[in-house]
Amino acid sequence: MEIITSLEQLHKFSAPCVVALGTFDGLHRGHLDVIETAKAKAHECNSQLAVFTFSNHPFEWIRPGMVPPALITGAQKQELLQQLGVDVLVDIPFNQQVADLSPQEFLQRLQQLDYSCLVVGANFTYGCRGQGTVYTLAASAKAMGFELIVRELVSEGATVISSTAIRQLIAAGEVAEAAAMLGRSYSISGTVAHGNERGRLLGYPTANIELEDAHVAVPLGGVYAVRVIVNGKSYHGMANIGYNPTFGDVAQPRLETNIFDFTGDLYGKQLTVQFVQRIRGEVKFAGIEQLKQQLAQDKNDCEEALR
């Protein structure tokens, strides 16, 4: 997959293509529908599949105090798009240059790509202050001679799938429901840091990921059944998100994961924690023995949820 990181580089990709356009800030099922539609069209036209998106959330520039937590990292996005068979990813920073483009100027820049068709979602906007809509885009398609495919929004039950809805589910601990909208389990990746090793003393050693500086959506505090990816291999496990109320000495929330049937040193290594189901909320226990008993029950509950 070729990756283009600025508008000035667009001309470097000269092959005929079909372009999926969108912010794609979560790569949820609605986004995937747009991309899969573009993929089918590209195959039909014997063209390359291009995805045009932004490497940062537009709010970082236009509403810096209201940037929503990320549902996916840049590396995860690139990996998923490569798995989908994308030929070229246009992943440019949303900055003042982009924010100031009028809808027509945006399309003129996009014409550096040799596209025959654009595919967007029904709520797609573009250009300065989102002045461009699917209706102005349809008029431009007619005038400029390209095909436009507008995909209807995708729903899960009675709810339209959106990144906002998914963030709300994650914040409420409803990770199974979030997974239904994402089309995959929500995950957090990070580098394993040293902790206080209380888990090891309790018989449940944990791999700890600090969440303080990670601008990602963090599930509601509690215990979760998880799958953990270590060196490309998947393990079952249980994770706790929170402040360790029994000990009361944690100032920032932590993600602590006990990986079942795993031995080895993980300090300094990357791992990915995929949230499958919330088991319970955070509890302050009267003592260590009560905590141990609960951890044993938690492990049983997690193993059951992961079957």
Segments the model singles out, each with a brief description of its role:
Residues 141-242:
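Glycine-rich, Lys/Arg-enriched anion-binding loops that position phosphate/diphosphate groups
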Residues 2-9, 90:
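Short acidic-hydrophobic, aromatic-tinged amphipathic segments that line or gate anion-handling sites
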Residues 9-12, 96-99, 155-159:
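A short acidic, often aromatic-flanked loop/helix-cap motif at beta-alpha or helix-coil junctions
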Residues 28, 81, 118, 178, ...:
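Residue-level signal for inorganic ion chemistry
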Residues 60-144:
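N-terminal Rossmann-like or analogous alpha/beta NTP/dinucleotide-binding catalytic cores
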